[in-house]
Amino acid sequence: MSDIPGVAVGLMRSLGSRPGDIRAAIGPAIGYCCFETDADVPKAVERWLGGDTEGLIRRKDLPGKYLVDLRGALRRRLIQLGLSPEHIAVSDECTMCLHDKYWSHRYTRGGPRGSQCAVICL
């Protein structure tokens, strides 16, 4: 896993920002309810967060299958980087559950490609 939050916070620090003053927003994404993976994803998240994954990974009844909270992992990483929890807004909308509102790669199961876009202004 690449550390995009770490790079972004590092860049903001180089521009004079203090991590505790940075605001972050995590938009709609596949939710904990729907992001089923094999063991490689939980292992990567565990490495990325230095083992701090409590509440972010749940083993499913199927052997070798897990549910992973990507938005929760991203929020956890931002907190590790020094952002204040109250400065992190997290959408609760799951792109898989709301596939009629958002494009979802998982929902199309390898069908037509799609994309989403976010705009950030300073």
Could you describe each region identified by the protein language model?
Residues 1-122:
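Active-site microenvironment for binding and transforming phosphate-containing groups
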